[in-house]
Amino acid sequence: MQNEQELKELVREKYSQIAQQEKTANQSSCCGAGNCSTEVYNIMSEDYTELGGYNPDADLGLGCGLPTQFAKIRKGDTVIDLGSGAGNDCFIARHETGETGKVIGIDFTTAMIEKARANAEKLGFNNVEFRQGDIEHMPVGGNVADVMVSNCVLNLV
């Protein structure tokens, strides 16, 4: 049986592999970098394509819903996304907060943070940032966020 740290490292390794492979490879692999299955990662994935702020490069198909849908995000809010991955939900939240708001994505995988930062840079967003860290010990101060969202991550903690 794996201890907590070994399990955490396994999850980190798998998500790193996902971040580093081509998006088309992600769609046919359920367990990392490689074609081990013809299934998609998540059969419950919602259709983001019509949402404001959607960016296909940030959508790795890893979520299981639309966490911003019921979050009541307002213009000017500061939003934290726990387990932000390549930034998909952050960019949608950024659309809702507008230019006066701020979105902070937190992920514990270096490769996901790098991918998310590259996506934000391509989009020219200056009010979306990505921080590496564990959500159990978030790399943010207290009383920072108006809204917190997470998409299929808390089950991994």
Feature annotation, model-predicted:
Residues K102-D107:
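Conserved SAM-binding motif I beta-strand of class I
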